[in-house]
């Protein structure tokens, strides 16, 4: 009897060892399949390995316990420690999972699921902020040609600060960096100056205008504010906005002047001219070139503009003038779809050796336009006026004064805009109010002086004197009286010319305050 029990115990031990060998073989096969990357296996490898390891852990203490005697040999109940339970577990685990994976998936991070990564910036872009590294397009670029802060800017605020209060600075706006760079290179090459640098937004360092100012200016101190009892002082007024239009040169003016004299109406139906003996003025219809309108406006060579409803033709005129036209369309006429006109009276520029001396002054009338009947443009004889531009400026100045004084005869006027050198008005259904009348008188007193062209012009002075005396007023010019006293003390053969040009080397003296009667100003 004891021999039978020993044999049965030996049988159980051998069965356990056999099961252990089978488990090792299965584990070795699983590892070999994972290393070879077999794609034909569709099973949950981690679950099986976990089951095998749990079985091995159970077999670790190789100690067999005696089982109770059975009714018949070989009819024992199933041993729960046998490895035969592994296939059942594997099948149950496999049915629980919907997605089948391969062993190679477990060697990859995140079980083979790719995680989207952020795209790296293009390595071709240079790290520095040079012109080639501009990735985002800007609406405009500004070239400041000269002055202490010359350069190419991509920010309106920096460029405006670089030009405010700087006399004689030249600047212009461009749509692209390529155009701005080309214009800057042309200027620096002609002036034999250094190449202008590109100054991005935030990197502009505006220095004092001169070393003298830097030495004499005291260092700024931070204001110390008290919580109570001290009123915070108001900030300094913002500087006047500077338009980014390059100053009209004498060559530009002579080109436009000659273009108007030679224009015969062929090739462009958006422009026609009004001609007289000495000058031809442009009239612009719908769809005219807005850049040409701007150049002609700055040269004082426009008579009339007939803009479209969207006002695209005048988009490059000064902002306040455009705003005045928009307000007239929306507030002063019932049908906003009606065509309008801008009738302009202007002086022309005057130059001296140092540059532009006088910018044109403008009186603009806005009104509702009827059917346009353009006059036939005629090619006129063009003369070289480079030597007698002062005479031409004097004639246009006298005509400008006459048109400004005619406002005194109009009783129904609405003033749309009053600036230092521009007056915009329109006809009104009501009588002119006192506020508008004062605005007109103030503009007349500021503009109608012998210094209308930027210097004391005897011809303008005599014209004002004749006009005022014709109206029954009194006029006296201190500058002319002083000149007469000098002439009386001079020798008999000395003569005084009726026309004088602008001073070429001396500073331009300030505008004289001429005495006029109340009738002269309306």
Swiss-Prot record:
Q: Where is this region: Disordered?
A: 111-133, 491-522
Q: List locations, semicolon-separated.
A: Host cytoplasm
Q: What is its main location?
A: host cell
Q: Share an example GO biological-process annotation for this protein.
A: regulation of translation
Gene Ontology cellular component annotations, sorted alphabetically: host cell cytoplasm
Q: Which UniProt keywords apply?
A: Host cytoplasm, Translation regulation
Q: Which InterPro entries does this entry report, sorted A to Z?
A: Ribosomal_bL9/RNase_H1_N (IPR009027), RNase_H1_N (IPR011320), RNase_H1_N_sf (IPR037056)
Q: Where is the composition biased (Polar residues)?
A: 111-126
Is rRNA processing one of the keywords? no
To which protein family does this belong? Belongs to the caulimoviridae viroplasmin family.
Task: Spell out the note in the miscellaneous section.
Answer: The inclusion bodies are the site of viral DNA synthesis, virion assembly and accumulation in the infected cell.
Protein's name in the database:
Transactivator/viroplasmin protein
């Amino acid at each position: 009897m004891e021999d039978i029990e020993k044999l049965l115990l030996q049988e159980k031990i051998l069965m356990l060892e056999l099961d252990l060998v089978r488990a090792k073989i299965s584990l070795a096969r699983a590892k070999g399949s994972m290393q070879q990357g077999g794609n034909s296996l569709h099973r949950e490898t981690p679950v099986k390995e976990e089951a095998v390891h749990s079985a091995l852990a159970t077999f670790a203490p190789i100690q067999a316990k005696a089982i109770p005697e059975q009714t018949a040999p070989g009819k024992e109940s199933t041993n729960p420690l046998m490895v035969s339970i592994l296939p059942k577990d594997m099948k149950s685990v496999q049915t629980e999972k919907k997605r089948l994976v391969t062993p190679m998936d477990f060697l990859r991070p995140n079980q083979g699921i790719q995680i989207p990564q952020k795209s790296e910036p293009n390595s071709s872009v240079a790290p520095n902020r040079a012109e080639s590294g501009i990735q985002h397009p800007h609406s405009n670029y500004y070239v400041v040609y000269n002055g202490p802060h010359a350069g190419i800017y991509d920010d309106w605020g920096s460029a405006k600060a670089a030009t405010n209060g700087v006399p004689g600075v030249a600047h212009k706006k461009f749509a692209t960096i390529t155009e701005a760079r080309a214009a800057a290179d042309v200027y620096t090459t002609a002036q034999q100056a250094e190449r202008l640098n590109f100054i991005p937004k935030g990197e502009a360092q505006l220095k004092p205008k001169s070393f003298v100012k830097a030495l004499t200016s005291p260092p700024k101190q931070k204001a110390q504010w008290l919580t109570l009892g001290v009123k915070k002082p108001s900030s300094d007024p913002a500087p006047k906005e500077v338009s980014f239009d390059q100053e009209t040169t004498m060559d530009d003016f002579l080109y436009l002047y000659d273009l108007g004299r030679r224009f015969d109406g062929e090739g462009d139906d958006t422009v026609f001219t009004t001609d007289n003996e000495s000058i031809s003025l442009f009239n612009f219809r719908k769809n005219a070139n807005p850049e040409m309108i701007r150049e002609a406006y700055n040269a004082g060579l426009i008579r009339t503009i007939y803009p479209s409803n969207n006002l695209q033709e005048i988009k490059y005129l000064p902002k306040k003038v455009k705003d005045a036209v928009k307000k007239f369309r929306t507030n002063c006429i019932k049908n906003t779809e009606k065509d309008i006109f801008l009738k302009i009276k202007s002086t022309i520029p005057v130059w001296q050796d140092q540059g532009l001396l006088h910018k044109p002054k403008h009186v603009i009338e806005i009104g509702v336009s009827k059917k346009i009947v353009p006059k036939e443009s005629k090619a006129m004889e063009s003369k070289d006026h480079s030597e007698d531009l002062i005479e031409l400026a004097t004639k246009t100045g006298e005509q400008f004064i006459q048109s400004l004084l005619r406002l005194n005869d109009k009783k129904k006027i609405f003033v749309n805009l009053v600036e230092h050198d521009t007056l915009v008005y329109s006809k009104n259904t009501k009588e002119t109010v006192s506020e508008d009348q004062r605005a007109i008188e103030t503009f007349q007193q500021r503009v109608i002086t012998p210094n209308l062209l930027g210097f004391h012009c005897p011809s303008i002075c005599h014209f004002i004197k004749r006009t005022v005396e014709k109206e029954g007023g009194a006029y006296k010019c201190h500058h002319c009286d002083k000149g007469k006293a000098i002439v009386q003390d001079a020798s008999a053969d000395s003569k005084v010319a009726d026309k004088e040009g602008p001073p070429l080397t001396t500073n331009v003296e300030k505008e004289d305050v001429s005495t006029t009667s109340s009738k002269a100003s309306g």
